[in-house]
Design a protein with these regions (language model features):
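Phosphate-binding glycine-rich loops and adjacent basic patches that engage nucleotide phosphates
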Residues: 22-30, 72-74, 92-96
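Compact, well-ordered interaction domains used in eukaryotic information-processing assemblies
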Residues: 21, 35-87
Length: 167
C-alpha cells in the first residue's frame, strides 16, 4: 500500500508572520511510518524517497502535515531537549551583557512542536518542564533587551546586537 501525502498551504502565508513563515522552511528530522520509492512532490519541492522507521530531513511545514496525518513522528531538535535548554538558560544567566547564540527561529519551531501531543510520547511532565525552560530562556533574553534599552542615553550613536534572534 502506497502512502500519499497531501499538502495544503493555501492560506498559510496570510496566517503567519515573517518569522513563523521562514521557520516553516527550516529542516527537522522525521521518522516516517511509510515507505515510498519515489519522492513526494509538493508545491515547495520534492522530498524523499522515504523508508519506514528511517530518519529523514524535511522542512518543518511538511513534518507538521505528515505528523498531523499520523504518517511520521517528529524528532525533537537537540536544542529542544531538557539538558540543552538548561545549558542555554544557564549560559544566558552567566552572561548578562551579551546574548548567547541560540538556534535561528528557536521560539517558532519550539512552540510549533510543543503544540503536538505526540512529540514527547505522551509524557506531559517532560513537555511541561521543556515549556518552562523555554519560557525562562525567553524571559532572560527579553529582560536583557529591556535593560539594554534603559541604559541608552538620549543620543545613542551605535547599536550592535549579536545573537538576539527573536529574544
Amino acid at each position: 500500500m502506497e502512502s500519499v501525502l497531501h499538502c495544503n498551504t493555501k492560506d498559510t502565508l496570510k496566517l503567519l508572520g515573517d518569522d513563523k513563515w521562514e521557520a516553516l522552511g527550516d529542516e527537522v528530522i522525521i521518522i516516517p511510518k511509510f515507505t515510498t520509492e519515489q519522492p513526494v512532490d509538493c508545491i515547495r519541492g520534492k522530498f524523499g524517497p522515504f523508508r519506514a522507521h528511517s530518519a529523514a530531513k524535511v522542512p518543518l511545514w511538511a513534518a507538521l502535515q505528515m505528523e498531523h496525518l499520523q504518517q511520521c513522528t517528529i524528532e525533537l531538535p537537540y536544542w529542544l531537549r531538557e539538558e540543552e535548554l538548561k545549558k542555554m538558560r544557564d549560559d544566558e544567566k552567566a552572561n548578562p551583557n551579551i546574548f548567547v547564540k541560540v538556534p535561528r527561529h528557536y521560539t517558532e519551531i519550539a512552540f510549533a512542536l510543543l503544540g503536538l501531543p505526540r512529540v514527547f510520547g505522551g509524557d506531559e511532565k517532560q513537555r511541561s518542564r521543556t515549556v518552562l525552560l523555554l519560557r525562562e530562556l525567553i524571559e532572560l533574553r527579553r529582560d536583557k533587551i529591556v535593560e539594554g534599552l534603559k541604559s541608552f542615553d538620549s543620543s545613542p550613536t551605535e547599536l550592535n546586537v549579536s545573537h538576539m534572534s527573536a529574544a
